[in-house]
Design a protein with these regions (language model features):
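A generic structural motif
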Residues: 29-37, 330-335, 357
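Active-site and donor-binding regions of nucleotide-sugar-utilizing enzymes
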Residues: 8-28, 38-54, 60-269
């Protein structure tokens, strides 16, 4: 029996790790492949524990570095200002100059390039499994080096993504005008030289990353051709969850030929639960100590603080508002909270307990199929609610105004706090209105998700095809290999 071939799985962040687990488990079960998780950076402690428990191989490419980013527990804390020496001030100023930043970025990416090359030399993979091909760093370095060797790459995005949301995220940064905007002549010059690295949102042209970063990345062939699109780099194929996802990426400029509709592997388990939702609901409600006959509201707690979209004090204020509204629904309606992998359970648990709310330890794909109403921010989890015909309230009190769900008749977007309670009551108490929303989700479901429980198998078949194609290309002389790659990967 041949030795299973290595598949390198680069999740990019802990949330992506959770989404990749279904595929990795299926790869191991097939016996044909040996998946290896690549953890690059910090935040993967829980992921490493899961790997050890399930016997999954993983590799740490570099030691996690301490972060100065504020944590939830720091919100509102008062820090005593420290006096800085003149030498410290001068050093800080020098670090901000373009030439120094360019040199630092060049050496940083040189080290990344070296790590990527060592991974490929040591592990000799048959394919790469990624969540994108545009994240400058190990992701784009692996894709470029793999393309040179004829090693295929498969992108499986797990989150909603478009250029507008990426721009809104940058516009929320305190110093966005100098960092990403056109205030500095360097930024303007780079956009003139490479218009594809810029994007205009609300009349403001933004650079994907600061000038030093994109220029250094371009030198090392790590800069994606179209960074504002999740699949805008040099990966071979992208497997998306639905017709909506495919249309969305094509609208952003991706090639139709690069995209295939496979469904979302994480939803395979959800599809089975949905088919047996009565029994599944009774089981979980018994575990939580709540009545399964009462209506069940599931809330994916927004992560505006975790994603730096709000200061932590404002994030907690928003969270407390939602919790207080949910508390008022008790005991006539059951409420269960679902936390994002980036969220710290210890920070949320006391607040939830104060309002008498349950935080589920189960993942969202176990909760949404058994719910009656789903509340979330703009989240990819909403697509599962569409697939399961569950009415949704999207809370957008800060008017991010993404247009992901504007045309879905089973989703209500609430942009004003004062309308949230009345909207909830309307859904929970007006059965005719509730049924309208259910019917709206049912009509949208075929366009938004492939919910047949076969997505993982389609992904495995696709990986098999790519591995075979890669083996054929690697038989060619090195100079001919690149010509046989997809046009966007050459």
């Amino acid at each position: 029996m041949p030795t299973p071939g290595n598949i390198l799985c680069l999740p990019h962040n802990p949330a992506a790790f959770s989404e990749m687990l279904e595929i990795v488990a299926a790869l191991m079960q097939s016996g044909r492949y040996h998946p290896i998780f690549i953890f690059d950076g910090s935040g993967y402690d829980a992921a490493m524990q899961v790997c050890e428990q399930q016997g999954i191989t993983y590799c740490i490419t570099r030691k996690p570095s301490a972060s100065n980013r504020s944590q939830p527990g720091d919100a509102g804390a008062t820090k005593r200002p420290q006096r800085r020496s003149n030498a410290s001030r001068i050093f800080s100023w020098v670090k901000k100059t373009f030439l120094v930043q360019l040199v630092l970025a060049w050496f940083q990416y040189a080290l990344v390039w070296r790590r990527a090359r060592r991974l490929l030399n040591t592990l000799n993979p048959q394919a790469l499994l990624l969540i994108g091909d545009r994240h400058i760093g190990l992701e784009t370095a692996l894709v470029e080096l793999a393309n040179r060797r004829g090693i295929p790459s498969l992108i499986i995005p797990f989150a909603l993504s478009d250029r507008d949301s990426a721009a809104v995220y940058r516009l929320a940064m305190p110093d966005w005008r100098r960092t990403y905007g056109m205030e500095r002549w360097l930024n303007r010059m780079v956009v003139r030289l490479h218009p594809e690295w810029g994007f205009t949102q609300n009349g403001e042209t933004l650079l994907w990353q600061p000038p030093a970063a994109v220029l250094a990345a371009a030198f090392w062939r790590m800069m994606p051709a179209n960074p504002w699109v999740l699949g805008g780099g040099a990966g071979w194929v992208m497997a998306v969850e639905s017709h909506h996802s495919k249309d969305n990426f094509i609208l952003q400029g991706m090639s139709d030929e690069k995209i295939t509709i496979a469904g979302k592997p994480r939803y395979d388990r959800a599809a089975k639960i949905w088919q047996q939702r009565v029994e599944a609901r009774q089981h979980l409600c018994a575990e939580w100590g709540i009545d399964p006959e009462k209506k069940l509201l599931v809330c994916a707690v927004p992560q505006l603080g975790e994603h730096d979209l709000l200061p932590w004090d404002q994030h907690w204020a928003e969270t407390e508002f939602l919790f207080s509204v949910f508390s008022d629904l008790l005991p006539h309606t059951n409420v269960v909270l679902s936390l994002h992998p980036k969220s710290n359970f210890a920070e949320y648990a006391p607040r939830a307990e104060r309002y008498g709310l349950v935080i589920a330890h189960q993942s969202y794909d176990q909760l949404i199929p058994i719910s009656d109403v789903f509340v979330a921010a703009y989240s990819s989890t909403v697509t599962l609610a569409i697939a399961a015909h569950i009415p949704v309230i999207v809370v957008d009190f800060h008017n991010f105004d993404y247009d992901f769900f504007n045309d879905v008749k089973g989703i209500i977007i609430v942009r004003q706090r004062e309308k949230f309670v009345s909207t909830l009551q309307h859904i929970l108490k007006d059965q005719a209105f509730y049924q309208q929303l259910v019917d709206g989700q049912a009509r949208a479901a075929q366009f938004w998700a492939r919910f047949d429980g076969k997505a993982t198998q389609r992904i495995l078949d696709l990986i098999g095809d790519l591995v075979t194609r890669g083996e054929e290309i690697r038989k060619l002389p090195p100079r001919e290999r690149r010509t046989q790659l997809p046009p966007w990967s050459r």
